[in-house]
């Protein structure tokens, strides 16, 4: 809420069966569709009544590049478009990646960085990128990939290692708890090729 400066967030992990490393897109679409109404109910319950919404922001694809597409993004985009049309308010669309970058800037109280070039690292289950970010007239920020992982992404590596240990996906939190009690530290170095990393060797 830009007037009260109130910021609310509700979230719920999508269910993944034990031993599996994620969801198929068809299952992800189903669970997004099923859980979105519940999330909206919780959000407005925590807000405390009817909200005077003046705009909607939504991630409609993974990255702002041609061909970037995942079906599960249609769930949020469709709901945002319906709400925008019904309420007569603008729907502002951006990528999932830019959403992560802006969230990091906001949490660090550095949103002013969108007015100047900066470097961002996007490290997740599907992405391990070094990104050059700069102001843009056509987008919130323009993102150019400098370096990436050529095989496994960092989050994939963590989850695969966790599943080998019998942990439940997503494995990051449980793996971190195990590491707190580790008896030794093992150093490992990623293979680099033309400035990009290869992480699959860690799994082996």
Task: Give short role names for the model-derived ranges.
Residues 1-9, 114-116, 122-123, 129-204:
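A short helix-loop
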């Amino acid at each position: 809420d830009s007037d009260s400066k109130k910021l609310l967030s509700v979230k719920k992990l999508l269910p993944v069966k034990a031993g599996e490393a994620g969801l198929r897109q068809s299952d992800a679409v189903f669970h997004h569709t099923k859980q979105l109404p519940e999330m909206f109910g919780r959000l407005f319950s925590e807000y405390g009544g009817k909200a005077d919404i003046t705009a909607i922001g939504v991630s409609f694809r993974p990255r702002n590049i041609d061909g970037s597409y995942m079906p599960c993004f249609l769930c949020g985009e469709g709901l945002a478009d319906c709400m925008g049309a019904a309420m007569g308010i603008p729907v502002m669309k951006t990528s999932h990646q830019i959403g992560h970058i802006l969230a990091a800037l906001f949490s660090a109280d550095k949103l002013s960085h969108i007015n100047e070039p900066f470097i961002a690292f996007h490290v997740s289950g599907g992405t391990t990128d070094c990104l050059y970010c700069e102001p843009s007239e056509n987008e919130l920020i323009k993102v150019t990939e400098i370096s990436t992982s050529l095989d496994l992404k960092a989050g994939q590596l963590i989850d695969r290692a966790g599943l080998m240990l019998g942990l439940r996906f997503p494995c990051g939190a449980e793996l971190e708890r195990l590491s707190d009690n580790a008896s030794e530290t093992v150093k490992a170095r990623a293979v680099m090729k033309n400035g990009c990393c290869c992480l699959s060797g860690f799994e082996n």
